[in-house]
Structure formats: structure tokens, C-alpha cells
Amino acid sequence: IEGVFVVVLAYLINLTMPPYIPEYSLAIGSGIILPLGFFYYVFAYFVICGGANATNITDGLDGMLSKLYMPVLLVLVVALYGATRIGFMDTVMFLPTVSGLYAVLGAAFGAVLGFLWFNAKPASIFMGDVGSLALGGFMGTVAMLLKSEIIMGVAAGMMVLILLSSFTQTMYFKITRKITGTGRRVFLRAPLHHHFEELGWSETKIVDRFFVLSILFSGLALVLLKFA
């Protein structure tokens, strides 16, 4: 069901593209277009479902998902501004049909900011899978609408690292168990934030430092957005 939904969504996203942008393509900075053909759907699956899983796994400590997610939204707003202004950024495709995303991104930012008020440590409410998966899928979908998937991946670098830590831990454990009979671990615990908890870091320190890193990743994404 998940795969069918992504295929339909990717097809609909492709329909929104202006006629001067090749169908089923990936933009790689400075107006470079890479046609993907059938692999566009595979790529869409990784972007949308990968984003959903990244935010879902990131939502493991009080306030962390909101603090890591908001900088990414701000990068997408800048990408949207560039996509709706001719000549503002040579690295962004001109997409006059996506200006309605301002309202959607603003609503998402406001919702996440409001949620943080109640989810800050000690949290009084929790998002759960429904909220975290939806935020990740939304992030990936907006990035695809803006042809800014790579920029989004860089901005969400901290969440990507958290996702990869969980994937690496699982795969390494399974492989070593199959080879040696005893599963081994790369991290003390996965995902990454639990590894640092095992090292004795406080929850507040982990969230704040990951937040700083998220800002740095988003800053790098803005640099790439302007000059790459």
C-alpha cells in the first residue's frame, strides 16, 4: 500500500511540473536536469518514505523532532522563494505553479512550533507515529514539488544521520550474527540519540547539540542553494 501511494503521489507531482522541465527528472543544481525515467518512482520512494522514517525515528526525545525539523522548513521556504522568482537563484528551477506552498509551509511551521511548546522537556504531549510520519512525508513531498530533493537531504542531515544509525545498527547486527553466530553492534544503542544517552549525556544536552548541528546542516543547504 505504501509503495502504491508513493507511485501515485510521484505521478501527480510530475503532472504539476511546467512543460519546459523534462518528465520524471531530478534537478542537480545550476539548472542541470537528470532524466530518471522509471527510476523516478524509486527515487520518490526513497525521498518520501525515507523522510517519513527519518522523522519517525528522530521523534525519540522530548522536543527533538520539532527543533530538528523547523530549520529544514525554513530552507524549503527559501527554496520556494527562489523557485517563484526569476533570476533570484540560478540553482533553483523556476516553478510558478508552486506559490501556494507558502501557506502550507507556514501552517506546518506554526503547527510544529506550537507542538514544541507542549513537547519541550518534560513533555506533556507526544506526537506519535501519525504525526512524525506525516511530517516526514510532507517534507519529502514539498522537496519533490520544488525539485530540491538534494537540498532537503542536506538540510535534514541530522535526521538522515539518525536514520542511518538505526539502519547501520540493524544490518551490522544481522550480518555479524549470520557470520559469527553472535550479533555485534556499532553503537551502544540505536538510534544515535540513545547511543549518546548510554554515554551519559543528558537528554537536554543531546537535543540542544543536535539542534545546533541541524542549524549548521541547514546553513550548508542554503549555501548550496545559492552557489551550487
Language-model regions, residue ranges each:
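Surface-exposed beta-strand edges and their flanking turn/coil or helix-capping segments
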Residues: 13-14, 79, 148-150, 167-169, ...
